[in-house]
A protein has these predicted regions:
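A short loop-to-beta-strand structural motif that recurs across blades of beta-propeller domains
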Residues: 130-134, 180-186, 225-229, 272-275, ...
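Hydrophobic/aromatic beta-strand positions that recur at structurally equivalent sites within the blades
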Residues: 76, 135, 185-190, 210, ...
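Ser/Thr/Pro-rich low-complexity tracts
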Residues: 1-82, 191-192
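Residue-level detector of Asp-centered blade-edge/turn motifs that repeat once per structural unit
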Residues: 114-120, 161-165, 210-214, 259-263, ...
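Residue position within the beta-strands of beta-propeller blades
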Residues: 123-126, 169-171, 218-220, 267-269, ...
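Gly/Pro-rich loop segments of beta-rich domains
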Residues: 74-108, 140-157, 174-175, 191-204, ...
Length: 364
């Protein structure tokens, strides 16, 4: 959503192509004008508040008339929700279509990664059963990196990068209760993420997260939402599964992992709640988690502190640095934002466990 700007005066003329406007040092297009009014939109990030106008003469022979308003206005940016890319047809259907932002579509996008490691800033997305696709924010193009068939996946699921961004790990919901099939695949940036290799074999799972302090990949399996990690086996010269702890005591359930950017702890989302597992720097291992926000099995939309708050289906989340925490000298400077999937909203959780709704409105 953009903010309208109307400028009133005299002798503006009736040709908007001859009127040039900058707001806060950023150029905006003159949408319309008459002799007494100019209509345009506030451009993005125009926070300085100074407005400059340049009007060319009707015949183009005289020097432009330039004017800068003495009075500055204070523009307060409002958070809004919009569509970056993708659309549906008249019946509300869509499918995976590559192309520019105007024509690209998504069939079943579920997981999202911000790729800040490459030369160009991109988003990496996939949905259950793929494909993995790249959204290039600079060229404004969408391309397919790998389909499920190309990677021999049973059911593509969660993704994460390693600490360098050179390796992309992908969970595979292959549906088996044995360790005969690949659970985590890895894709390399050097190959443009177009070849999937086996990283570790295990039972079916849904999520993975990388611990930067120990350079270890953690992931979940279905049974009790158990957290496993991949460790090197000198006998096989490969990675094998090692159980760390179960998330749930008495249920088999999906669990999704997000490791703190500094490796201090790990959030585990699922079953209507958020668990927190602290990292022990002496043992170099995550500890058995405790309930941090929401309540296991209690589905609702309630903004409230800690376990008195409620989630419908807490799904993928990400840590976001809060500059106010940094200025205040707090030990943890990150808020946690997650998608409350069936609640149709984005929730925010502070380091103290305060739950609020950031965008959308919860529906149960």
């Amino acid at each position: 959503l953009r903010t309208q700007l109307h400028i009133y005066g005299e002798n503006f003329g009736n040709d908007p192509s001859k009127i040039y406007i900058t707001v806060g040092g950023r150029t905006t297009t003159t949408i319309g004008c008459n002799n007494n009014e100019i209509y345009c939109m506030i451009p993005p990030k125009a926070f300085d508040g100074n407005i400059k106008i340049s009007i060319e003469s009707a015949d183009g022979t005289s020097s432009p008339i330039e004017y800068e308003f003495e009075r500055r206005f204070q523009y307060v940016s409002q958070t809004s929700v919009g569509t970056l890319v993708g659309n549906e047809d008249e019946q509300g259907n869509s499918s995976d279509v590559d192309g520019d932002f105007e024509n690209a579509r998504f069939g079943n996008a579920e997981w999202l990664l911000m790729d800040t490691f490459g030369i160009q800033k991109c988003l990496i997305v996939n949905g259950f059963k793929g494909p993995i696709r790249r959204i290039n924010l600079e060229t404004q193009e969408v391309s397919t990196l790998m389909t499920e068939g190309q990677g021999l996946f049973g059911g593509m699921y969660y993704m994460c990068f390693d600490a360098t961004g050179d390796t992309l790990f992908v969970s595979d919901d292959h549906g088996q209760s044995n360790k005969d099939r690949r659970e985590i695949a890895y894709l390399l940036r050097s190959e443009d993420f177009r070849r999937a290799r086996p990283y570790v074999y295990d039972r079916t799972g849904y999520s993975c997260a990388y611990q930067p302090l120990t350079k270890t990949l953690y992931y979940t399996v279905y049974w009790q939402g158990t957290i496993d990690k991949a460790v090197f086996d000198p006998t096989t010269q490969g990675m094998v599964a090692k159980e760390v702890f179960p998330t749930y005591e008495s249920r088999n359930e999906h669990a999704y992992l997000t490791v703190h950017p500094e490796g201090k702890y790990m959030y585990i989302t699922g079953a209507n709640c958020l668990y927190k597992s602290m990292f022990n720097p002496e043992t170099k291992e995550f500890q058995k988690p405790t309930m941090f926000a929401g309540s296991e099995g209690a589905s609702d939309w309630v903004d409230s502190p800690g376990t008195s708050g409620r989630f419908v289906w807490p799904y993928q989340g990400t840590f976001v640095k809060n500059k106010d925490y940094l200025e205040a000298g707090k030990s943890d400077i990150y808020d946690f934002y997650l998608c409350d999937r069936n609640g149709h909203c984005i929730r925010k959780i502070t380091p103290d466990g305060i739950i609020s709704t950031y965008a959308g409105r919860g529906s149960v």
